[in-house]
Amino acid sequence: MSGSGDRRGGGPPGSHSGWETMGKKSKKPGQAGGRQWAPWSSTNVTPNTARPAWGGSGSSHPSGTSWAQAPDHGAATRGNPRPPSQTSRPVLAPPLANGWQWQSRPRPSGSEVKKDDAPPSGSVPEVENVDGNNTSDDDDDDDDDLSDDISDDYDSDASEKSFETRKTNKWFKEFFEVLNTLSLEQINEQTRQWHCPACKNGPGAIDWYKGLQPLVSHARTKGSTRVKLHRELAALLEEELSRRGTSVLPAGEQFGKWKGLQESTDREIVWPPMVIVMNTFLEKDEDDKWKGMGNQELLDYFGEYEASKARHAYGPSGHRGMSVLIFESSAVGYMEAERLHKHFVNQGTDRNSWHLRKVRFVPGGKRQLYGFLANKEDMEAFNKHCHGKSRLKYEMRSYNEMVVIQMKQMSEDNQQLNYLKNKMVKTEQRSKAVEESLGVVTQKLRETIEENIFVRSKAKEKHMEYEEEMKSQEEIFHGLIEDIHKATEDKEKQFEKLLQEERSKARRFDVDSGTMKDRQLRKEYVQKFIDCQVKDVAEFEVERDELIKVHEDKKLKLKKEYMDLELELEKEFDAALTGLMEKHKPDTFEASSS
């Protein structure tokens, strides 16, 4: 950017009268030839404004500090149209009182953000892009600024430049100078707030990032303006933190830093579980040797705790006053031993009491027993004068393995047992319900079968009655038909007899008396009568046959219709019976699954 008026030297702007102008030749006609920062006006800030640096908490806020509001005629933002008269020149907020000290600026409250966003009085506010016509031009300028800035400080091949040289870029120099003054603890503070140096004098310059992780994420993902500059910032930050022996914390680790429990709570315990009982002396015998409790006597004293065995320690002087209660080799046995141990603790007769302020006798002359869970040193002391098979055998085992895991397994088994018990109860309830339902259904089935037998017998009786009635009606019907047939036969016989009589009369007629003519006439008349009768008989036979045929056809047709009607009647009966059976069909029995 030779020939431009940009600020050099890398230092932050001081408290002098104003910023130096940085300009760049425009690559596009019609655009402004450079960018300017508005002069610093001391009248815009309340005189006694204090801007203390945060100590990582971000809680310090300016008191009574605000930017003066811009004049109404300059408010081209929030949807107002762009002034058509001149090319808009973005004017940024005045510099900080102490220079570009990002970490030293207090984060404004919600009400102060709105005030700080406004430009100072007397300056022209930056006009938003309403119609979207100049966005690409601004982006091109930003990319050009980045290219020029990098090429001004060092050669274009960034991969060959040293890390320290890249940090002296004018965009990052002040940021890394501040970063170098902080310790690792201060850098990793999640409450420390930062501005993005790559967004300086542009959109997002006033945004705060709580911790370096959000800042690095912003630099990695920035995709609209100054993309190369943001990527360079992300790479430099990661390299800087790596060289200083730290890294950017993941987002999930930014909050909630607490010290938890120890990694392991396991310990070694004596197995099988044992409780040492001290002061079990009784008295000395004639040989000046101590006598003490017996095994059963010791078990009886602590019968509430279900110890399985008892042993006593003996030495050259007899009973050593040290006894042990051995419990079952299980998690339950350990819990019993621990319960006895806690009983001694609550009573004030535990290990500490025995070692620090042992009181062997209580008022009345009785010996006070002390007890505690056995450890390895106790067992070695117990076996001090024991050799070979007389030594009390034990081993040191993992508490988690022998107690915790077994208790968890017992809990799971108990839950499984409860589940199986509940399941068994439900199964028994279901079985009982099914049995009751089966009894009810069986009773109903039995009653239904009896009802069906009764209905069938009644139906059979009715059927027999109907058959007898139909048979009787059929006999009457056949009798009437037989009577008709008999009457018809009688009529036919009478008719034939009449024909024969008339023919006989004609044949017996005297045709020989009288004249020849008369005889001839009488013969012709008789012959004609006989011929006519024969002819009539022949016609009668023909017509009778036709009548019989017609009658038989009618009978056949009537029988067919009757059979069809009977068949239809049987079908109707079958359909009605099927519907009745469907109506009274018993429900399907299914065992309840609930």
From Swiss-Prot:
Q: Which UniProt keywords apply?
A: Coiled coil, Developmental protein, RNA-mediated gene silencing
Q: Where is the composition biased (Acidic residues)?
A: 136-157
GO process annotations (BP): defense response to virus; regulatory ncRNA-mediated gene silencing
Tissue expression pattern:
Expressed in a dome of cells at the tip of the meristem that extends into the adaxial side of the initiating primordium. During the later stages of leaf development, expression becomes restricted to the margin and vasculature.
The annotated regions of Polar residues compositional bias extend over 39-49
Q: Which InterPro entries match?
A: SGS3 (IPR044287), XS_domain (IPR005380), XS_domain_sf (IPR038588), Znf-XS_domain (IPR005381)
Q: What is this protein called?
A: Protein SUPPRESSOR OF GENE SILENCING 3 homolog
Record the organism: Zea mays (Maize)
